[in-house]
From Swiss-Prot:
Pfam families: Amino_oxidase, DAO
Region of interest (Putative sarcosine oxidase), ranges: 1-450
Catalytic activities: sarcosine + O2 + H2O = formaldehyde + glycine + H2O2; L-pipecolate + O2 = L-1-piperideine-6-carboxylate + H2O2 + H(+); an L-alpha-amino acid + O2 + H2O = a 2-oxocarboxylate + H2O2 + NH4(+)
Protein name, entry field: Putative bifunctional amine oxidase DDB_G0291301
GO biological process: amino acid catabolic process
Cofactor(s) the protein requires to work: FAD
E.C. number(s) listed in UniProt: 1.5.3.1, 1.5.3.7, 1.4.3.2
Residues that bind substrate: Y886
Region Disordered: start-end pairs: 445-464
InterPro entries linked to this entry: Amino_oxidase, FAD-dep_OxRdtase, FAD/NAD-bd_sf, Flavin_monoamine_oxidase
Family: In the N-terminal section; belongs to the MSOX/MTOX family.
Lineage: Eukaryota, Amoebozoa, Evosea, Eumycetozoa, Dictyostelia
Broad enzyme group: oxidoreductase
């Protein structure tokens, strides 16, 4: 019987690499009885710990990764001291250099992106020009526009010494170490015990025996080999790809004129010819004291060989990768012999978002924890500490939700018989970047991994990004080129921004009591910050959520939604309505005692009518044979209408043929596909379909008629294609039973009494400059002549059209922001509601056996879309209110010209009644007998909005959107509201933009603890909406004035988006008339 089988254990660690050893050491040091099992021998090079050096780096773009790296620095010293080995890391510093524009979605983030975190953490750095790089380092032929960032708090890990130290410490603290012990199966026996089946091989490799050993807890730390344990034990496997990374050792020139690398270095350049097999990412180490003099490791940060199982590892190294490195050395480091002395390789396990997997195994009662994937060597002491805390306490003091096993809608897990859900990178091996868009500062509180310690139990996991969010991310990332030019400006004011602002003195003025304003107030109140809401409308709050109640009948359903009325149940909308997310608005309101009553919204039903060209069909009618008479054949012959070949198939097939090209391109070559999408922003939908379909204009007009409102194809094609992707998966829709304004009223009830001041029409926002020359407050003036108000920050949440009437000249806004406020396109939308004595459309007899229980009917008549209520269906005596006309764009402009005065509206109602009767094939007189009242609403003629919802024109997304996400030059005036969000046109855009504005305020004021609380209580937004480089931040005449306002000159929240996105594979078919009419 093997000696190690005699006992039960507190912890068994499966995998004896660096992470496993660090975990075993930490647990044993805490007094636990620990067994560490290694399938091979300790110190073997068959996994990821081969070679003699690794990078310890602290330059990260993401806040949370920078914080973890900073925390690890002290733990490396603690580990070295405990082992009695002294320094385990040689702190040489790190030079990052290369193309400052590299990294818009690339695997390494950006060259300049880490600077904000270095400043926030008080870590030194220096920006170098190309000439300075070549003067201080042995590099040559560096392009003149390239730049460098040197940071001293980085170093070379002495890998052999680290492994030896960890092994020695494990033995020192009583951990049993067993090699040639392969874990075959883990069973969870109870809430407090696991059983592990081990195949143990004798030293001579001849005799194998299987045994079982029990433990209270287990850790799987076998990294590339983890699926060999997970799959047989738990019936699923981790969707990971393993890179066979190659590196080479070159001989540097010796002697008095030796080639000396003073530090580690990393070079950022884009791929040659956009070919990922021609990567230009290279890194290197100086010659280290624990190896032969003048031997320097230099390597390509890419891997042509990628495998799924470590047992498929190739013999030798990949010559392609070595030759790429040799070419670069020959070109840029003439003092190094371009023939490698020798080459080495190591395995690097990776998942779709390039981050760690660090979590409890599901359904094991938190008895089994796992770690795998990512570039982890630099975090070894911290990972050992985290894993030991999870094993001992079931929680850790560090925020690790970014590394959760269930992130990405389960994209990491492949169950038996399933195909992978994620898309792994194909060539490049990202070293230190994540797909998550919002960082989380290390919280001082203890946070369990399966639930949060805050009252709401909110998870900080960043949501999966939609294509629309990815598009915005890319636009924001492209504005980093001038980053280094204003570091000197930041440094001049650094001392002024070194202390935290007083929360007591921090006041926020919110202009507008719509969804964005109310949501911002809820967040600020939760964070303990002062705020006031200034609403222009004396009659109501809620902005473009407007539930009108007809006065004649007071029953529950005598209502009509003149604004937002339906919500798709898709991941994008989680922040609004997902009750499974404790940070969603509906969850917050329910916890406050205001449950939002949702019911299904019927977007379309089979009996809905489609009436075009005088032809009436039902929504479930197939569109294969031109039933609506759009074809040349039905209109007098060739050239009279639409060519037959286009009309004798579902119109959706014609659109899908174009849109699917984007799906295929993004799947097959993300970078190329995304470039195509970016370029498409310059097109209108009409122009793109005409040029790229290519479809004749008659066909484009036909598609627009069937697909959406008249004139909407003149808007940006990028809007069309992103909606197509984002909403393709949405089958379920919701509405609010009793009126959407229940959301608004519930939000108001959660706020402190008296915080909303109605009738406050803002006329001017200006700066108040203190004695120091910094902007100390913003002053808000009002139309009623009352005394202006002072606030530290102002969030404007109304429409940009209404903001246009406010004097902002003193704020010195950027040109692009002023242009956006003036010219950003808002769509026109009109709703006309009719109240009847009864719901005749639900009466089977009245409708000849075809009642309509919700949904919509579509027509080419002026009313265009008729919407039947989804609430109160089938209930006796319920009010008969329907939307007789819901129009957008040109249709809305024309019908809206009759909205306003009573005589015009009487003409309009007669027209609507006639159209309604014609669509439903009933006499107008019959409907007149049932008619009670009407309500018309034109959002363009509304005094307080002057537009329905933002819908960008060609190029506006790429040209104007980035400026809308930034505050004013002093960091105190913030734009929110749906138009400033990537999800404009939807309530979720209002919520996300409000979150972003509050986050910016916390950044400017240096309130990092409140930023952690924000993420803890309110989760993350799925948008990359952090402020980026803009001309407004370069102006040296405007000093930023908050303790942390420097961030707004250089904070680039980079997102490497390639592996994060998966194009939809199965779009909903549009082969029946039910699809006609669009969504908005």
């Amino acid at each position: 019987m093997r000696e190690f089988l005699k006992d039960d254990y507190d912890v068994i660690v499966c995998g004896g690499g660096p992470v496993g050893l660090a975990t075993a050491y930490r647990c044993a040091k805490a007094g636990k009885k620990v067994l560490c099992l290694e399938k091979s021998v300790f110190f073997n090079g068959g996994g990821s710990s081969g070679d003699v050096v690794r990078m310890l780096r602290t330059m990260y773009t993401e806040d949370y990764m920078a914080d973890l790296a900073h925390e690890t620095l002290g733990l490396w010293k603690e580990l070295g001291d405990d082992a009695g080995e002294g320094d385990l890391v040689w702190m040489t510093g790190l030079l990052n250099f290369g193309d400052p524009n590299y990294g818009a979605g690339g695997p390494e983030g950006t060259l300049l992106g880490p600077i904000p975190n270095l400043e926030r953490l008080g870590m030194q750095y220096k920006v170098l020009t190309a000439q300075e790089i070549m003067e201080e380092y042995p590099f040559r032929n560096i392009p003149s526009n390239h730049q460098g960032v040197f940071a001293p708090d980085n170093g070379v890990i002495n890998l052999p010494l680290v492994l030896r130290s960890l092994y020695k410490l494990c033995l020192q603290y009583g951990c049993k170490m067993v090699s040639h012990a392969e874990v075959k199966l883990i069973k969870n026996l109870s809430t407090t015990m696991v059983e592990i089946e081990v195949e143990h091989t004798d030293v001579d490799q001849k005799n194998k025996q299987s045994f079982k050993v029990k433990s209270k807890k287990a850790a799987i730390t076998s990294n590339s080999f983890c699926n060999h344990i997970i799959k047989p034990s738990f019936g699923w496997e981790l969707d990971m790809t393993i890179w066979e990374m190659t590196s080479s050792y070159f001989v540097a020139k010796p002697g008095p004129n030796a080639t000396v690398f003073k530090s580690m270095w990393f070079n950022f350049q884009n791929d040659t010819d956009n070919d990922p097999t021609k990567s230009n990412l290279y890194y290197g180490f100086p010659a280290v004291p624990w190896m032969t003099d003048n031997h320097c490791r230099i390597a390509l940060d890419a891997a042509l060989r990628q495998i799924k199982d470590p047992n498929d590892r190739h013999d030798g190294v990949e010559t392609h990768d070595v030759n790429r490195t040799r070419d670069w050395v020959r070109e840029h480091i003439p003092g190094v012999d371009d023939t490698p002395l020798f080459n080495v390789s190591a395995l690097m396990a990776n998942v779709y978002d390039n981050m760690f997997v660090l979590d409890f195994i599901p359904e094991t009662n938190n008895n089994v924890v796992m770690f795998a994937c990512g570039w982890a060597m630099k975090f070894i002491p911290l990972l050992g500490k985290i894993l030991s805390q999870l094993l001992d306490e079931g929680k850790t003091q560090y925020p690790i939700d970014h590394f959760a096993l269930n992130r990405g809608n389960g994209a990491l897990i492949i169950k038996e018989g399933q195909t992978p859900k994620s898309v792994n990178s194909q060539v490049r091996a990202p070293r230190y970047t994540s797909m998550h868009c919002k960082p989380l500062t290390i919280a001082k509180s203890t946070v369990p991994t399966n639930q949060s310690s805050n009252p709401d139990g909110a998870s900080s996991t960043a949501p999966t990004q939609s294509l629309r969010s990815l598009f915005a991310s890319r636009l924001l990332q492209r504005s980093v080129g001038m980053e280094a030019k204003f570091h000197s400006i930041i440094a001049k004011n650094r001392s002024k921004r070194s202390t935290k602002a007083s929360q007591k003195d921090l006041t926020v003025g919110i202009i507008g009591a719509g969804m964005a304003g109310l949501y911002a107030a809820m967040i600020l109140q939760d964070l303990g910050l002062q705020y006031n809401i200034l609403e222009a409308n004396k009659e109501r709050v809620g902005g473009r959520i407007y539930t009108y109640r007809f006065p004649q009948n007071q029953d529950k359903y005598q209502t009509v939604e003149l604004g937002a009325m339906r919500f798709p149940k898709i991941e994008i909308m989680d922040r609004l309505l997902n009750l499974d997310k404790p940070w969603s608005l509906f969850s917050k309101l329910e916890k406050a005692g205001h449950k939002i009553p949702t019911i299904p919204y019927h977007l379309t039903v089979d009996n809905n009518l489609v009436y075009y060209n005088g032809k009436r069909i039902f929504a479930n009618t197939l569109l294969n044979d031109d039933p609506l008479y759009f074809s040349d054949t039905h209109n007098g012959g060739p050239g009279t209408a639409v060519p037959d070949k286009y009309t004798y198939q579902p119109y959706g097939d014609l659109l899908d043929a174009v849109y699917k090209k984007f799906s295929d391109d993004l799947e097959n070559d993300f970078e190329s596909g995304f470039e195509t999408l970016l370029k498409s922003d310059n097109y209108s939908t009409r122009a793109y379909l005409f040029e790229k379909g290519p479809y004749p204009q008659s066909v484009v007009n036909y598609l627009e008629t069937m697909d959406t409102g008249t004139g909407l194809y003149d808007m940006a094609f990028s809007e069309t294609i992103m909606d197509y992707f984002d909403f393709s998966a949405g089958d379920e829709w919701l509405c609010i039973d009793g009126g959407t304004d229940i959301i608004v009223n519930s939000m108001v009830k959660t706020l402190r009494p008296g915080c909303i001041e109605q009738g406050k029409v803002v006329t001017k926002v200006s700066r108040v400059v203190g004695k120091s020359g910094d902007v100390s407050n913003l002053k808000v003036d009002f139309l009623d002549g009352t005394e202006g108000r002072l606030f530290k920050h102002v969030i404007s949440t109304g429409t940009l059209a209404s903001l246009r009437r406010v004097d902002l000249s003193d704020l010195k806004l950027s040109h692009n922001k002023r242009t956006a406020i003036r010219s950003l396109h808002y769509d026109h939308s009109v709703k006309i509601a009719l109240s009847f004595k009864s719901r005749w459309w639900e009466d089977s007899k009245f409708m000849n056996g075809k009642p309509m229980l919700g949904g919509k009917s579509s027509t080419d008549l002026p009313v265009r879309t008729i919407v039947y209520p989804s609430y109160g269906i089938g209930q006796p005596g319920v009010s008969g209110v329907l939307i007789v006309s819901y129009t957008w764009s040109l249709d809305a402009s024309r019908i809206g010209s009759l909205v306003g005065d009573r005589p015009s509206e009487e003409v309009l109602i007669k027209l609507c009644m006639a159209n309604l009767a014609e669509v439903h094939n009933v006499p107008v007189a019959t409907l007149q007998q049932l008619f009670v009242d009407y309500k018309c609403w034109d959002w363009y003629n509304d005094d307080y909005s002057s537009g329905a919802f933002a819908l960008y024109s060609p190029s506006q997304f790429s040209q104007l959107f980035p400026s809308l996400t930034k505050p004013s030059p002093d960091g105190r005036f913030h734009l929110a509201g749906e138009a400033t969000s990537v999800h404009h046109g939807w309530v979720i855009g209002s919520l996300n933009s409000a979150y972003r504005s509050v986050d910016h305020i916390l950044q400017v004021e240096g309130l990092d603890e409140l930023r952690a609380k924000l993420r803890l209580n309110w989760g993350f937004i799925d948008e990359v909406e952090d402020p980026q480089d803009d001309q407004q931040y370069v102006d040296p005449h405007h000093n930023l004035s908050g303790p942390n306002a420097k961030k707004f000159r250089s904070n680039v929240s980079q997102v490497a988006i390639q592996p994060r996105f998966k194009a939809p594979r199965n779009f909903k078919p549009r082969n029946t008339a039910a699809s006609i009419g669009g969504l908005k």
